[in-house]
């Protein structure tokens, strides 16, 4: 199964759906779903996902290279792994999504969207995670969902962590720093993301890794993310990664800007970078007689997007943590 990406993009079902790799067994489950199980017993389970948005190709290429290293035997596997290429049709078309944004649908929220390939895929992925986690006795559960951002950023690589009732494990946060993430953003409320689903329903330590900017296949400079790729290789093979000399900056979400109607106006232009700072009192958005302003001394914007569909998030506002 050294042609997993090509099969996924072509929508082709392989003639052989399971086999042996170098020290592990592989099983093709469905388009964009591949399970890897080490020959030796392990108590760690990892979801490695990318391509939830079809125009975010750099992480997909990274996963493809990791799979090649595993199949060649140059990388040893020490986790049970479920590799997920989230939205095969959008990946093949080179577009963000075909009908609706899948990363708003998880946790059953797909039921509130018009039925589409994305709603069916979200349901399939939920069931795939349930089967994967229930079929093992993993003491450690991680989910790393790899993305790229639409906009440029003051932090080239950063992580977004779902709301979690329990404290985050220091080893997990330290690994994210070792993977080259310059900032970590902590959600304070539940959401429909893939990582919130895996965290809430299966207790996984989950993070959305944002790695640079969305570009088509073949146009990515993967050397920008070599530190992340090296950290993933070390993780898969069970090698300790050195702690980052510059721990990631930490932010928490303090508010969400939502577009409710066609009257919505977001006062940020196309050049506004993620993590741009705004002073207290700055007018951020208007919609009819509703005004959205900065309420803390300084707030930082994340994922500003005035073109989202009505009812969806047009941006997050953050505050820096000490």
Curated annotation (Swiss-Prot):
Catalytic activity: N-succinyl-L-glutamate + H2O = L-glutamate + succinate
Note describing how the cofactor binds: Binds 1 zinc ion per subunit.
Top enzyme category: hydrolase
Pathway the protein acts in: Amino-acid degradation; L-arginine degradation via AST pathway; L-glutamate and succinate from L-arginine: step 5/5
Catalytic residues (UniProt): 210
List of residues binding Zn(2+): 53, 56, 147
EC number: 3.5.1.96
Cross-referenced NCBIfam families: arg_catab_astE, PRK05324.1
Protein name: Succinylglutamate desuccinylase
């Amino acid at each position: 199964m050294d042609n997993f990406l090509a099969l996924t993009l072509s929508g082709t079902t392989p003639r052989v759906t399971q086999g042996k790799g170098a020290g592990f067994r592989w099983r093709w489950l469905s388009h964009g779903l591949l399970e890897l199980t080490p020959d030796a017993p392990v108590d760690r389970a990892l979801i490695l996902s990318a391509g939830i948005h079809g125009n975010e190709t750099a992480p997909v290429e990274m996963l493809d290279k990791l799979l090649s290293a595993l199949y060649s035997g140059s990388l040893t596997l020490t986790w049970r792994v479920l590799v997920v290429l989230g939205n095969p049709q959008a990946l093949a078309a080179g577009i963000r999504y075909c009908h609706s944004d899948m990363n708003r649908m998880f946790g059953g929220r797909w039921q509130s969207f018009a039925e589409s390939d994305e709603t069916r895929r979200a349901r399939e992925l939920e069931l795939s995670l349930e089967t994967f986690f229930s079929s093992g006795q993993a003491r450690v559960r991680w989910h790393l969902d790899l993305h790229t951002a639409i906009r440029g950023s003051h932090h080239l690589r950063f992580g977004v962590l779902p709301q979690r009732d329990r404290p985050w494990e220091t080893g997990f946060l330290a690994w994210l720093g070792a993977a080259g993430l310059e900032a970590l953003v902590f959600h304070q409320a539940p959401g429909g993301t893939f990582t919130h689903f895996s965290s809430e329903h299966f207790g996984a330590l989950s993070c959305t890794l944002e790695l640079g900017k969305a570009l088509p296949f073949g146009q990515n400079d993967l050397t920008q993310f070599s530190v992340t790729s090296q950290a993933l290789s070390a993780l898969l093979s069970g090698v300790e990664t050195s702690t980052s000399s510059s721990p990631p900056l930490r932010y928490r979400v303090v508010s969400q800007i939502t577009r409710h109607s066609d009257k919505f106006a977001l006062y940020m232009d196309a050049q506004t970078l993620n993590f741009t700072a705004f002073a207290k009192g700055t007018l951020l958005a208007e919609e009819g007689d509703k005004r959205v302003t900065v309420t803390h001394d300084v707030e930082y914007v994340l994922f500003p997007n005035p073109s989202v569909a009505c009812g969806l998030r047009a941006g997050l506002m953050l505050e820096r943590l000490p």
